[in-house]
């Protein structure tokens, strides 16, 4: 919630547009089993102060008339929003440069210098940077940084594949997800023993319409190593599943596909903060598919930790130290 609050004024603060919008969102529910899961999720979200509720399938169709009769109910939040991830990244980088930051692109980190049991530098393909603080923010590649100092970072790359349609007139007013997609996110074991080919591949539904009219249609969650290709097998299952919810999409043209790797942490929570294992090392990784959503608050927490040695929120439950036995 705090990250969403930051996004509302982020374009003004950074001096560059991040294209943040807040249209609200629906998580579509097909079965009684899914409904029971989402009722528990919504109850927990309400305890955290989130404005979210379970609505009927008919009410969901009033919001999005193209939805099929397969939808029994939905979880609805008027506060769901999104930003352009590329524009947001570039806006942060531009502002950082204005404030004196230096970026070394196409530069490989080759090691961490440790002296007297603490971080004293970062070794790169362009030379060494002397520093008493190093932030591990390498996403799915964070385990390779951990190995440099003997730490086992329990993160695996989790691929997601997305399709982009031809531009269409404004069709969808809300962001759309499905309950199965949420369940697979937190319980990847659900996909293992299933006879459903789509479920085996971690296929769910996510639909978002861009300001240019293109639909971003996905998605799936699969452990495929560091392979960033797309596959016909997965995209076919995504199409089969998505058209159960929005039948007219079977007649829409796909113009391109892409994939990305999410940093999946073994216990489902990100790793944020310092560690007793190595003073000077700070983690900001393992956000899985929530990286862009949680980027502003994560950056603020890490910045406070570096400057003040503490954060305004208790982040101890996100510490790497929870994995030290």
Language-model features: locations:
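Active-site substrate-recognition segment that forms the wall
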Residues: 16-20, 113, 118, 128-129, ...
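Short loop/edge segments at beta-strand edges and connector loops
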Residues: 56-57, 105-107, 256
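Helical element adjacent to the flavin cofactor pocket in flavoenzyme catalytic cores
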Residues: 75-133
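Short beta-strand to alpha-helix junction loop
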Residues: 27-37, 76-94, 104, 229-234, ...
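Redox-cofactor binding/interface segments in oxidoreductases and associated redox assembly factors
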Residues: 136-137
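C-terminal lid/capping helical subdomain adjacent to the catalytic/cofactor pocket in oxidative enzymes
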Residues: 54, 59, 101, 271, ...
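Dinucleotide-binding Rossmann-like beta1-alpha1 core, especially the glycine-rich loop
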Residues: 1-63
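A general structural signal for well-ordered alpha-helical segments in protein cores
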Residues: 3-7, 35-38, 57, 89, ...
């Amino acid at each position: 919630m705090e990250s969403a609050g930051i996004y509302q004024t982020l374009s003004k603060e950074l001096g560059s547009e991040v294209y943040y919008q807040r249209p609200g969102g629906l998580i579509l529910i097909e079965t009684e089993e899914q409904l029971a899961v989402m009722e528990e999720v919504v109850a927990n979200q309400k305890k955290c102060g989130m404005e979210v509720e379970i609505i009927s399938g008919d009410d969901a169709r009033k919001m999005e008339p193209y939805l099929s009769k397969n939808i029994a109910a939905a979880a609805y939040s008027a506060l769901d929003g999104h930003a352009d991830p590329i524009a947001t990244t570039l806006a942060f980088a531009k502002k950082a440069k204005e404030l004196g930051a230096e970026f070394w692109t196409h530069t490989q980190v080759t090691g961490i210098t440790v002296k007297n049991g603490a971080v004293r530098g970062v070794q790169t393909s362009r030379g060494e940077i002397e520093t008493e603080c190093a932030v591990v923010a390498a996403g799915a590649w964070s385990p390779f940084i951990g190995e440099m100092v003997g730490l086992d970072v329990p993160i695996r790359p989790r691929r997601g594949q997305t399709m982009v349609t031809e531009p269409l007139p404004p069709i969808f007013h809300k962001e759309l997800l499905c309950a199965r997609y949420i369940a697979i996110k937190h319980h990847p074991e659900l996909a293992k023993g299933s006879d459903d080919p789509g479920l085996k591949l971690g296929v769910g539904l996510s639909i978002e319409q861009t300001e240019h009219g293109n639909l971003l249609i996905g998605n799936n969650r699969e452990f495929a190593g560091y392979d960033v290709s797309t596959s016909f097998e997965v995209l076919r299952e995504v199409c089969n599943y998505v058209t159960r919810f929005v039948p007219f999409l079977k007649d829409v043209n796909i113009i391109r596909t892409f994939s990305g790797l999410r940093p999946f942490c073994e216990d489902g929570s990100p790793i944020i903060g310092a560690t007793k294992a190595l003073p000077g090392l700070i983690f900001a990784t393992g956000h899985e598919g929530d990286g862009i959503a949680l980027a502003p608050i994560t950056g603020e927490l890490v910045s406070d930790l570096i400057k003040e040695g503490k954060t305004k929120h208790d982040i101890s439950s996100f510490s790497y130290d929870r994995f030290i036995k």
